[in-house]
């Protein structure tokens, strides 16, 4: 059974600036993440930033496992 959560990083280029996370949904395969996050970004820097959104599986013993990921940016290469 999975213990999923979502982690969102605000990035400028390759540099991670700020992180937000959802609560962990214990023992579920069909979580519903109804969350909103806000980041303070100066308007003149908005085109330089991106959001790295990762769905993770929490693990008490070992390393948390990446389930899925998307990078939201003006231009992704």
What are these regions (language model features)?
Residues 5, 18-29, 33-40, 51-77:
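C2 and C2-like phospholipid-binding beta-sandwich domains
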Residues 10-12, 60:
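Short acidic, glycine-rich loop/turn motifs
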Residues 4-10:
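Extended low-complexity, serine/threonine- and proline-enriched intrinsically disordered segments
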Residues 40-46:
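Short, surface-exposed loop/turn segments at beta-strand-coil junctions that are enriched for proline
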């Amino acid at each position: 059974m999975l213990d999923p959560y979502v982690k969102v990083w605000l990035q400028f280029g390759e540099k991670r600036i700020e992180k937000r996370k959802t609560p962990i949904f214990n023992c579920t395969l069909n979580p519903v993440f109804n969350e909103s996050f806000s980041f303070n970004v100066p308007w003149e820097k908005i085109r330089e930033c991106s959001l790295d959104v990762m769905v993770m599986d929490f693990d008490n013993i070992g390393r948390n496992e990446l389930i899925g990921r998307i990078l939201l940016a003006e231009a992704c290469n």
